[in-house]
Amino acid sequence: MVAFDANEILTPFCEGHREGAILFDCQRMRQVEYGLFVPAWWGERAHPISEGGRGSAWFVEASFGNAVLRQYRRGGMIAMLNRDRYFWCGGHRTRSVLEFRLMRELISRGLPVPTPLAACYVRHGVQYRAAILMERLEGVSSLAMCVRGNSKEIHWEQIGRMISRFHREGLDHADLNAHNILLDQAGQCWLIDFDRGALRIPATKWREHNLARLLRSLLKIRGERSVDAVYRDFERLCRAYDLAWGRGC
C-alpha cells in the first residue's frame, strides 16, 4: 500500500470525445493538459527513444526540465489484437497512476529512481489508455548499452548492491532487465520502469525470480561475448547482492 501524498493533484479533463484525468506533482508542475502526453503536441521537442521498450517512449524538452514521456503498450501476441488498451477497473487502478505513486513511494525511501512528474489516463468505455511523464536522468546509459559497447567500466558490484536495496524495501520489479538499469560514469546506478511493480514482504522466491530475469536479459544481449563471460559478470553482481543483503543494506 502506497501512502497518500499531499503534493499530488488529480485533475479530470474532457477534451472532445476524450475523458480522463491527470495526476501530477504540484511542486514540479504548475499546469497540466492532455497534450503533454501526446508526442505530436511537443513537435520538434520530442525525440523517440530507440533503445528497449516498444517504440512507446520519447525524450521531451519541457519548460519544467527535460523529461521522458512513455505511453503504455502491450507486448507479446496480445499486442497484435490490442496494442495499448487495458480494462478499466477505476482511475486509482490504472497502470500510470499505480506506477506514479509507486515511484514516489520509492523516492521517499531514499531509493535511486527518476522523479515522476505526471500520469494520465483516457477512458474508452470499459477500456483505457495511459501514459506517464517523468524526469530525464542526464549523463546515463543503460546497462544494455554498456554491455553491447563492451565497456570495461561496468560496476557489477554496485548494481548488485542497488538491487539488494530495492529488494530490502520490498520492491518486486516486474521487468528487471539490462535496459531498465541506468549507469553513469562514476558508477551510480538507477532503476527505471516500475509498471506492474509492487511492494511486497521480502521473500526468496520473487527476489530470485527478479535476478533470473536479469540474467536472461544479459544472455540475450551478449552479442559476441561468451556465455561464460556473462556468468562471470553476473556472479560478481550476485556476490555483492548477497553480501549487501546479509548486512541488511
From Swiss-Prot:
It is an enzyme of class 2 (transferase). The active site is at 175. Its EC number is 2.7.1.166. It is found in: Cell inner membrane. Pfam families: Kdo. Keywords: ATP-binding, Cell inner membrane, Cell membrane, Kinase, Lipopolysaccharide biosynthesis, Membrane, Nucleotide-binding, Transferase. One of its GO terms (cellular component) is plasma membrane. It is a peripheral membrane protein. One of its GO terms (biological process) is lipopolysaccharide core region biosynthetic process. It catalyses: an alpha-Kdo-(2->6)-lipid IVA + ATP = a 4-O-phospho-alpha-Kdo-(2->6)-lipid IVA + ADP + H(+). Pathway: Bacterial outer membrane biogenesis; LPS core biosynthesis. It comes from the Bacteria. GO terms for molecular function: ATP binding; kinase activity; phosphotransferase activity, alcohol group as acceptor. Catalyzes the ATP-dependent phosphorylation of the 3-deoxy-D-manno-octulosonic acid (Kdo) residue in Kdo-lipid IV(A) at the 4-OH position. Belongs to the protein kinase superfamily. KdkA/RfaP family. This is 3-deoxy-D-manno-octulosonic acid kinase. It comes from Xylella fastidiosa (strain Temecula1 / ATCC 700964). The gene is kdkA.
